[in-house]
Amino acid sequence: MVISQGDIWWAALPEPVGSGPGFDRPVVIAQGDTFNRSQLATVVVIPLTSNTRLAAMPGNILLSASNTGLPRDSVANVTQIIAIDRSLLTEQIGRISPRYLELLWKGLDLLFDR
């Protein structure tokens, strides 16, 4: 399976615990391509949600369905960044633009006080 940073994939996440991400949902591949091309069994992703109200939260990014291949407008929720097993990635949906990727890094910088 070939994955690249900025790709959007469907992920079959397990049942959520508390307010964590779960179930089948789109995710953005956040992990760098050096690691994506390696033999690592895991990949770092940012889960997406169709709850567009979360776009108002600091660091989150509203992704337009028309620009990404997503079935509906969604929000990259940077506070839920997780590492998952690659086998949970089921189908590539699309890709975020370089502009969105830059906004994603700014959101992560904010999350980590950088």
Question: Positions of the model-derived regions?
Answer:
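Conserved functional hotspots at enzyme active or ligand-binding sites that engage polyanionic ligands
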Residues: M1-R114
